[in-house]
Amino acid sequence: MARPRSFDEDRALDTAMRTFWANGYESTSTRDLCEVLGLDRSSVYNAFTNKRELFKRALTRYMDATTADQLRILDDHELPAIERIRALFARILRTEAENRRDGHGLGCLTVNTTMELAGRDPEIALMLARDAERRAAGLSAVIRSGQRDGDIGSTRDPAELARFVNAVIAGIRVAAQGGADDATIEAIAATAMDALA
């Protein structure tokens, strides 16, 4: 009979997620993970198989939570479409402000992973592409609604505008990670909103 796990797997995933988010995949060693999780190597391997599988689970957890939060904002039918997108940018800006350390943001685990791994890891690239498509589909529906209702003036294709908004959000994350101050990233968001109007 297998021994029951003596740790909280959800808490371990959250801790691993924050560690990968702060350090990146390559810069996080199995030893680092054992240390922050308070587990020995065999416990980590028994629970998660290896560092890569732990990373994939942590990334999935991050994407599920982040995308669900963004889609919840976009699904607020109490607000006009343009205000839902403004609320989404406000959430992104607030998250960047909350996750600053030493003048630099942590960015976004999804964006960080795209830059670090997507070009050389097809499985991770597919995970990231599916997540981006979920967010783009939600944005596209809101933009289409806003165009129909007249509160989004741009006549460009909603799918193109959704990809644009996603790219701006990624750019905000990278700028914050590079040390851009609040005024700079707020201006980026405001410029994107102007492009939609």
Language model: regions and residue ranges:
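Hydrophobic/aromatic residues within well-ordered alpha-helical segments
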Residues: 51, 58, 62-66, 77, ...
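Helix-turn-helix
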Residues: 11, 19-61
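N-terminal intrinsically disordered/low-complexity leader segments
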Residues: 1-7
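Hydrophobic alpha-helical connector segments
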Residues: 72-106, 158-165
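Amphipathic alpha-helical packing segments from all-alpha helical-bundle domains
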Residues: 83-87, 105-106, 120-148, 160
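Amphipathic C-terminal alpha-helical segment
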Residues: 95, 99, 115, 120, ...
